[in-house]
Amino acid sequence: MSKSFQQSSLGRDSQGHGRDLSAAGIGLLAAATQSLSMPASLGRMNQGTARLASLMNLGMSSSLNQQGAHSALSSASTSSHNLQSIFNIGSRGPLPLSSQHRGDTDQASNILASFGLSARDLDELSRYPEDKITPENLPQILLQLKRRRTEEGPTLSYGRDGRSATREPPYRVPRDDWEEKRHFRRDSFDDRGPSLNPVLDYDHGSRSQESGYYDRMDYEDDRLRDGERCRDDSFFGETSHNYHKFDSEYERMGRGPGPLQERSLFEKKRGAPPSSNIEDFHGLLPKGYPHLCSICDLPVHSNKEWSQHINGASHSRRCQLLLEIYPEWNPDNDTGHTMGDPFMLQQSTNPAPGILGPPPPSFHLGGPAVGPRGNLGAGNGNLQGPRHMQKGRVETSRVVHIMDFQRGKNLRYQLLQLVEPFGVISNHLILNKINEAFIEMATTEDAQAAVDYYTTTPALVFGKPVRVHLSQKYKRIKKPEGKPDEKFDQKQELGRVIHLSNLPHSGYSDSAVLKLAEPYGKIKNYILMRMKSQAFIEMETREDAMAMVDHCLKKALWFQGRCVKVDLSEKYKKLVLRIPNRGIDLLKKDKSRKRSYSPDGKESPSDKKSKTDGAQKTENPAEGKEQEEKSGEDGEKDTKDDQTEQEPSMLLESEDELLVDEEEAAALIESGSSVGDETDLANLGDVSSDGKKEPSDKAVKKDASATSKKKLKKVDKIEELDQENEAALENGIKNEENTEPGAESAENADDPNKDASDNSDGQNDENKEDYTIPDEYRIGPYQPNVPGGIDYVIPKTGFYCKLCSLFYTNEEVAKNTHCSSLPHYQKLKKFLNKLAEERRQKKES
């Protein structure tokens, strides 16, 4: 294009005030160049900058005219005379009268804000040397300036839905000016190109516009890294409020590039942040979703997303930045902000103010507040606050506050292990619904030592970092009211019970299991649950239990071809019997019973049998019968004594077993059984001396008198509590195998011959005198490969054995493997005998 055409174009544009920017095709760069001419006319730029603006106006005008566009640019010397006409460019009508009467400064500010520029952008541009600014590189410079501003860190005073009434409003320009801005934008930029970023309303009523803005932002790698700029005019303070002032609404856009640049954008402020910042700092659940984190300016849409956000490194970094902006604010008690506001007390991070001690008195009254800076980082070492500010408040509390841990097995042990090396633990409290724990040390120095250590060393629970700091809200933890004088037993609370799992179902004795733990210390008590393949062994001290656990962690424990899992029991700290101080005695009695089942003892049933046979062969069989009755009464008394001693322990063990696998046992208990309540109790029982009770029960059954029958019923009721592990002792199992098959073979001899000469079993004596068991209730001797009682295995969710209260998913396993097991056979025999007894009683009545 010729120079004359350019000059004539400029003349027409300066005289004609009705040119339309959209019709002329002016983009963002042309609009930005217009804004550069305004400060030149208003005297905000020096003389060199004015000449520079004139140069840029000429260059941009020439380039736009070459594309066929009609520019509305003017030189710096004539911009002051043509300001009103330039302001009207692109308008579809004259501006409101109130806007025309305003000063040039207000009009220029409106134009700059509408184009996405500010006076600070002009100041930045004025620092460039004149020889480096040319019409060719001016668009790139302007884009870099605008991108650099949008990349600055977000403000910390964003509002959010539902909570705007409790926070300080951000600074806004007067209402009439704001309406004029909106009117100007609405009239002037309806037909802008799609490449120009839209003007956004940051009222946070809707996140759709802002999210769309972030989607359309064009990030490039060639960002300006000239250094950090001062924000002297970014904030201003008033007497009672802390309002955030922005040069334009566009400075609230964008996300921070890094912590160094973030910290340079904010100045230290007095008092406390808005309530929305405090709530997000403590990670309180939002009232509704979607929710905008007022600290990070990040929208979240669910509880899971909110939990991940507050536990992330980005949120922790912004929280640390918030602490640096408000150095006087103490996040633990928030007294600098709420001054005892009851709402903040209810919304505190600890939902149990009645269990913990009273909060300490406020330290913010009467002077500037100096509060501790807890550890906020995920690694507990990267985001420490100024610990020296806490020295004046250390003596007020000895409670260590642990947050953001993940729950798992042995959680209490993991938490107490964090602070145990620093001193004696007086008390502790682990919250159920919130992942927070409070541990009270014996002295303040111990608590402070633990907190100081974890400011430099990461505190790990289950391999994941947690936050550890000294609680200033609670000085100590109250003890339960019912036990004011009871001392806290650290070893007792931590537990000394070893849990063995993945044990074989059968084929071993109690002593074989106890030998696994004997090398590590003295055994105080134990519970063996063969049907559940687990055992609980209580050691005399916790050190002995820990020694076994630590050793088995390093070297796997193998028992009868199975790798046994060994860990410290989380549910049971010790095995307590209902009768106090009987645990050791019962254990000794169990050991004595083991010794009683020696090879000599095994001969006693056979001797008794031979004596009975000899007495029956004599001419006076009544004498042998009297001897049998006496021996039966003696055995009954011994059995009754043993049962009265062991009944409390068995009941307790059944409760323990029910609590071991609550989820597993719930399905078994809630699903009804036709056998009755006694069979359910039988599944919950656990016994370690069943081998002796079986021969004694046989001796009881030899008594045919009515009194012995009543006593037999009592013994049977107690005995049914012990049916889960019939083979509790190896020797007992051998005795059962030696005596019961003999007795059952005698029954088989009775069936075809109807001969009463062979009465080795006391039950046959009873049947001979009073009643003979019908064939439908008879059961032959136990044979491992012959299943019995298959009718009691019924299909439900799987295949449920009503006798044993067990579920199986495989029918073959249920009806072949399970029904061929010894415990199932013994329960089937008991049940059939019970039915036969009930039928006999009905006939007698």
From Swiss-Prot:
N-acetylserine: modified positions: S2
Annotated region described as Disordered, given as residue ranges: 147-174, 187-213, 342-394, 588-785
Lineage: Eukaryota, Metazoa, Chordata, Craniata, Vertebrata
Residue positions, PTM Phosphotyrosine: Y158, Y202, Y219
CDD domains: RRM1_MATR3, RRM2_MATR3
Gene responsible for this protein: Matr3
Modification sites for Phosphothreonine: T150, T679, T739
Gene Ontology CC entries for this record: nuclear matrix; nucleus
Protein name: Matrin-3
